[in-house]
C-alpha cells in the first residue's frame, strides 16, 4: 500500500496527475490488501471468489477518490492534475460513483445470492443516501459526503466479513 501511495502522488509518473488514480486505488486498496491477506492465510490466489471480493472492496474505495476529486476538480485542473473527473467533467462524478457502487454489489451477488444479499440492505440504503448527497452537495458540503463514503467502505467490509462467516 505504501508503494501505491508513492506511485499515486510521486515518482517520475505520478498516477494522480494522469487520470490513473482510480486504477491505483482499485489495485492498492482492493486487490493488494485483500489478495495478500488471503495468500498469507491460504497460500493461494487462484480462488475466483477472492478476486471478486477484492474488486468489490477496491471499487467501493475508488468512490472515496471520486468524491475527493469531484470536490477538488477546479483546483486540480488549475494545478495540471488530470484526474478522471477533470478529464471527463464534473457531471461524470455522480455517475461514476453510482457505477462503482453498483458494480461492487453486482460482484457480491453471485457469491452470496439472495439471502446473503439481504444483509446488504442497510449498506444499500446508506450508499443510496450518500450518492444522493453527492449529486447536490457543493464545496465544503462534499467533506460530509467524503466521510459518509469512507463509512460506507468500512461498513461494506464488515458486511462482507459477516457474510463470509455465515457462509462458513
Language-model features: where?
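Hydrophobic residues within alpha-helical transmembrane segments
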Residues: 20, 52, 99-102, 151, ...
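Membrane-embedded alpha-helical segments that form the functional core of polytopic membrane enzymes
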Residues: 1-6, 46-67
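Helix-coil boundary and interhelical linker segments in multi-pass alpha-helical membrane proteins
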Residues: 33-54, 106-116, 161-168
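Small-residue-rich segments of transmembrane alpha-helices in multi-pass membrane proteins
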Residues: 23-38, 57, 86-90, 147-161
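Transmembrane helix-loop-helix
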Residues: 1-10, 99-141
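Intramembrane alpha-helical segments
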Residues: 1-45
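Hydrophobic alpha-helical transmembrane segments
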Residues: 23-27, 51-55, 94-98, 117-119
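Solvent-exposed interhelical
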Residues: 58-102
Amino acid at each position: 500500500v505504501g508503494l501505491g501511495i508513492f506511485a499515486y502522488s510521486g515518482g517520475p509518473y505520478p498516477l494522480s496527475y494522469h487520470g490513473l488514480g482510480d486504477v491505483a486505488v482499485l489495485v492498492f486498496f482492493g486487490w493488494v490488501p485483500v489478495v495478500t491477506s488471503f495468500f498469507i492465510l491460504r497460500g493461494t490466489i487462484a480462488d475466483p471468489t477472492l478476486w471478486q471480493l477484492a474488486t468489490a472492496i477496491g471499487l467501493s474505495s475508488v468512490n472515496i477518490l471520486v468524491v475527493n476529486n469531484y470536490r477538488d476538480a477546479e483546483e486540480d485542473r488549475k494545478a495540471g492534475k488530470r484526474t478522471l473527473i477533470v478529464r471527463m467533467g464534473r457531471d461524470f462524478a455522480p455517475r461514476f460513483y453510482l457505477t462503482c457502487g453498483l458494480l461492487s454489489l453486482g460482484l457480491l451477488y453471485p457469491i452470496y445470492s439472495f439471502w446473503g444479499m439481504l444483509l446488504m440492505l442497510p449498506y444499500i440504503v446508506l450508499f443510496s443516501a450518500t450518492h444522493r448527497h453527492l449529486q447536490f452537495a457543493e464545496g465544503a458540503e462534499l467533506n460530509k459526503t467524503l466521510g459518509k463514503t469512507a463509512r460506507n467502505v468500512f461498513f461494506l467490509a464488515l458486511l462482507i466479513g459477516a457474510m463470509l462467516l455465515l457462509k462458513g
